[in-house]
Amino acid sequence: MEIEIATIGGYEEVGRQMTAVRAGDDIVIFDMGLNLSKVLVHDNVETEKMHSLDLIDMGAIPDDRVMSDLEGDVKAIVPTHGHLDHIGAISKLAHRYDAPIVGSPFTIELVKGEIESEQKFGVENDLVKMEAGGTMEIGDRCELEFVHVTHSIIDAINPVLHTPEGAVVYGLDKRMDHDPVLEDPIDMERFREIGREGEGVLCYIEDCTNAGKKGRTPSESTARRHLKDVLTSVADYDGGIVATTFSSHISRVSSLVEFAKEIGREPILLGRSMERYSGTAERMGRVNFPDDLGMFGHRKSVDRAFKRVMNEGKENFLPIVTGHQGEPQAMLTRMGRGETPYDIEDGDKIIFSASVIPEPTNKGQRYQSEQLLRMQGARIYDDIHVSGHLREEGHYQMLDALQPQHLIPAHQDMKGMAPYAKLAKSQGYKIGRDLHMTENGNTIQLVE
């Protein structure tokens, strides 16, 4: 059976992920993502109103024209998790393919939200929920399997396409967390089984984000302990404390809510994405928030919440807000500009439970946001976070578990892939033979 890989997006940058695997006449697409940095450089861009061709020209979503080079039918579109760099282009591209969108339950709920907010295209693909550990047939001879992984969002999976020639494992995105906060540990046992079943692993497509960092990525439990230590250290402060983190990071938001209660403050979730992600997780029973937890996304309701905080005393509340990357219209940035009823005063504490996404736009916007906050006298507590991506030792462990015949590095530009290439070469792989360094828009024929 012919096996061909199309590297459509995410092979020259961190963002707009999209990969297609052809096994005979059957094709599975993994991810359809957005490159947020290409959107953020433009003022007041509303992607939901834009045409896909304009977004492709901007470099914001994958250019999927290479799909015309693949001879076969798309059987499934499979987002690995709910981050926008993996699902943000589904509302723009999925309607081109007569195939269901298959994902974990939380991911599919987020995809549904993306589709409902789309104003340019009608997306009528079936939405199919499949739990980690589940399988579905792809054509007559292949099978799709979901393996549970841990990442900085709940319900992340690594999909595996089992073919007669061996398994193709799509390894984006994960960290090797054996002590997570809300979920089960990563299913390394299943990865080891896949590496030793049948024909083994034909190809492993891997996220290289942190491949150049030594050691292993700490557990979310480590970030939780750090966060508790910081909040406990400021528990006696009688002014404002504000926290910000990734809205999609339900485990971190849950910890912030819990620790706010422990230091005698009422947590409030503020911002559209904060309300969307946490509200979805709560409705699905994936997180247990206090019954009285307020979530406010619309501008007027947010302002009413801030007025209540100011009237009843900032010392009684912990607003948990959007804006950890310094996004211009996010809540924390607006607070820094003085555009909300919340007054930041000298000595108030701002807790960033997030790292800066390593893109120039994000770095610049985060710097500007911090400077605005400091100008008002705020004290910044930074980088209370652990990454959602494997470091060097995690990559060694995955290679040992899967023992793949071929490797394709992804989720970086060529410079960012170099550390992974060096790591792979130390394990006996060779560029041009079984280590495939590639770019967007290419195809790789693994089996002819």
Curated annotation (Swiss-Prot):
Q: Does the keyword Cytoplasm apply?
A: yes
Q: Which residues bind Zn(2+) 2?
A: 85-86, 173, 411
The entry's localization annotation reads: Cytoplasm
Q: Which Pfam families match?
A: Lactamase_B, RNase_J_b_CASP
Q: What is the free-text note on the cofactor?
A: Binds 2 Zn(2+) ions per subunit. It is not clear if Zn(2+) or Mg(2+) is physiologically important.
Q: Which cofactor does it need?
A: Zn(2+)
Q: Which SUPFAM superfamilies does the record cross-reference, listed alphabetically?
A: Metallo-hydrolase/oxidoreductase
Its Gene Ontology cellular component terms are: cytoplasm
- Superkingdom per UniProt: Archaea
Q: Which residues bind Zn(2+) 1?
A: 81, 83, 151, 173
Xref: SMART domains: Lactamase_B (SM00849)
Q: Give its E.C. classification number.
A: 3.1.-.-
Give the UniProt keywords, A-Z. Answer: Cytoplasm, Exonuclease, Hydrolase, Metal-binding, Nuclease, RNA-binding, Zinc
The enzyme's first-digit EC class, named in words, is hydrolase
Q: Name one GO molecular function term.
A: 5'-3' RNA exonuclease activity
Gene3D superfamilies referenced in this protein's UniProt entry, alphabetically: Metallo-hydrolase/oxidoreductase, Ribonuclease Z/Hydroxyacylglutathione hydrolase-like
**Which sites bind substrate?**
385-389
Q: What is its main location?
A: cytoplasm
> GO:BP terms for this protein?
RNA catabolic process
Similarity-based family: Belongs to the metallo-beta-lactamase superfamily. RNA-metabolizing metallo-beta-lactamase-like family. Archaeal RNase J subfamily.
Please describe what this protein does. An RNase that has 5'-3' exonuclease activity. May be involved in RNA degradation.
Subunit description: Homodimer.
Q: What is this protein called?
A: Ribonuclease J
**From which organism does this entry originate?**
Halobacterium salinarum (strain ATCC 700922 / JCM 11081 / NRC-1)
